[in-house]
Design a protein with these regions (language model features):
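Conserved thiamine diphosphate
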Residues: 1-86, 111
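Thiamine diphosphate
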Residues: 5-6, 57-195
């Protein structure tokens, strides 16, 4: 889904899948970061009840997790600890966000990177604790700005901790043909855009 469809173009480049599926009652939605996480998630999800959707990266996914990684159902992962800003990313955008975290660190900005592995249900506790600590948040997703991670985080904050949310997302556009790196640039999803 998303830009990992690359040269298959718009017919394979779903930027609205999460938004559509979030509206289905009892649906659980995972946005996997890399192959290691996909493998771990499938092993656990097979033993759960109810409908699940796993958004799986294609061959272009940059590895984030190693073989010692342990996936926890419906939990976000804190990838880096920080005090100045919270970056909540999902799927392939976790790797891009990690690059941005390193650039910010060079400037003395401490970013906490959270991998929102589950978009529905959202791990509100982990995400909210981080946002309350930093008081600044940006979401990063390989999905339409409408109905995905940005929407889920914003909906939570409206009720629990009103705060402006910055976003890196596909800005209400359709997919198109291109190489992974070209599409990252075209849709403004690069680590430089996050930075």
């Amino acid at each position: 889904p998303g830009i990992t469809a690359e040269l298959n173009g718009g017919t394979h480049m779903s930027f609205e899948d999460i938004a559509t599926l979030r509206s289905i009652p009892t649906m659980t939605i995972y946005d996997a970061v890399d192959d290691t996480q996909v493998y771990q998630a499938i092993k656990q999800i097979m033993n759960t009840d109810g409908p699940c959707y796993i958004r799986m990266p294609r061959k272009t996914a940059q590895p984030v997790y190693d073989e010692n990684y342990k996936f926890a159902l419906n939990k976000a992962d804190v990838i880096t600890k920080g005090n100045d800003i919270t970056i909540v990313a999902s799927g392939i955008m976790v790797a891009e966000s990690l690059k941005a975290v390193l650039k910010l660190k060079e400037e003395g900005i401490s970013a906490e990177l959270i991998s929102a592995n589950t978009i529905k249900p959202l791990d509100e506790e982990t995400i909210l604790n981080s946002i309350k600590k930093t008081n600044h948040v940006v979401t990063c997703e390989n999905h339409n700005v409408i109905g995905g991670l940005y929407s889920a985080v914003s909906e939570m904050l409206i009720e629990k901790y009103p705060l402006h949310v910055d976003k890196i997302a596909v800005m209400d556009q359709f997919g198109q043909v291109g190489k992974y790196s070209e599409l990252l640039n075209y849709y403004h999803l690069t680590s430089n855009d996050i930075y």
